[in-house]
């Protein structure tokens, strides 16, 4: 492995799913100049196994791993340089995480414009994966809200990029580019104004997959800023696809109960506990998932105008630190795909295949995506987005390869932030602009200074 100084450590790394481990030399420093020098050493060596930036490791796949090479932990580079309530702009280092940003920005009446399923994500990672959230139909993905970024490229230069400037092509290749165009050092994000830290939520339950699809197709989505659903992927038809749908918008002060109005912008997102690493493999199965799913569905119910805090409405899993340990040391595979809106019958077939497979998932997300952005490798396209978590067991690899084939056949795609096993051939077929992206990448990094396990697997170098 390439040595870049005393602060590096050989470390076994995985994604959040705890699969596909590899060992890399990890550099962890708050010194931006040291990061620049480390990249220069990789370049001077001719690239070798290369370098890749890593944030909090919440990607489920291998995009922030670099076996035999250098991984640069960006979390110490975490200064919030400025917050401007008038322009709604924040100037922040790439290692700032969304939890930290939310706490700092709320007193200014500003909200993070796009939140994924956890706040434990760095800004650099949010850009590199072009994360999306419950408001994709109304706000798009994270890259839509980046007004500029400073990118350390393979030649040692730090380039200031904007979405419409001279280097716009490189800007959009970096959004969703999984860190392979360079290292995002700093960014300016346009935030969302808010008068409270709470949501006004409406809940609905559906009895079948057809009802779930109908609810998302009747035009009511446009009334809500945020929308997502848990759905049942275990029960046989007609219960298959039944859902607990949660939709809402940020609350105004007038909508809050009296006890909350004195501190409407108070950050209210409690964590209950951190799970110990004691759970055996196999505990997550049909017999545990089935009753939990039934309970979750029954307790959800129909409601209107409920005031909820950030954890209740958006991040229930953040109440449990290290919740991925519940799947045991073998881990789990999070499979996320999107199918074009018009291919609804094909989408329903895939859900049926998942239910009949013998591979069971409880933590299931259903979301109808809105318009896509300009980034060649950005995941969201208008369509039916599904995310399921499969415990690792025999036969899973063969099954998800068959799912890949169906998703591709129906015009869909997988999300790089959730994948550590699909093939280069499949990925390239799913992303028709991948050659355009590779061309941009090679212009700024002809020596392949920036590399990762994912990049080698998907032939992106």
From Swiss-Prot:
Effect of residue 17 to C: In strain: TRC11; Ty38c-resistant mutant strain lacking Rv3406, but sensitive to moxifloxacin
Gene3D superfamilies reported in the protein's UniProt record: 3.30.465.10
Annotated phenotype, changing residue 368 to P: Significantly less susceptible to Ty38c inhibition. 7-fold reduction in catalytic activity
E.C. no: 1.1.98.3
Alphabetized Pfam families for the sequence: ALO (PF04030), FAD_binding_4 (PF01565)
Cellular-component GO terms for this entry: periplasmic space; plasma membrane
FAD-binding PCMH-type domain location: 19-194
Pathway, per record: Cell wall biogenesis; cell wall polysaccharide biosynthesis
Regulation: Is inhibited by 8-nitro-benzothiazinones (BTZs) such as BTZ043 and PBTZ169; BTZs are a new class of antimycobacterial agents that kill M.tuberculosis in vitro, ex vivo, and in mouse models of tuberculosis. Is also inhibited by dinitrobenzamide derivatives (DNBs), which thus block formation of both cell-wall lipoarabinomannan and arabinogalactan via inhibition of decaprenyl-phospho-arabinose (DPA) synthesis; DNBs show high activity against intracellular growth of M.tuberculosis inside macrophages, including extensively drug resistant (XDR) strains.
Family assignment from sequence similarity: Belongs to the DprE1 family.
PANTHER family: D-ARABINONO-1,4-LACTONE OXIDASE, L-GULONOLACTONE OXIDASE
Further information: Was identified as a high-confidence drug target.
Protein name according to UniProt: Decaprenylphosphoryl-beta-D-ribose oxidase
Gene designation: dprE1
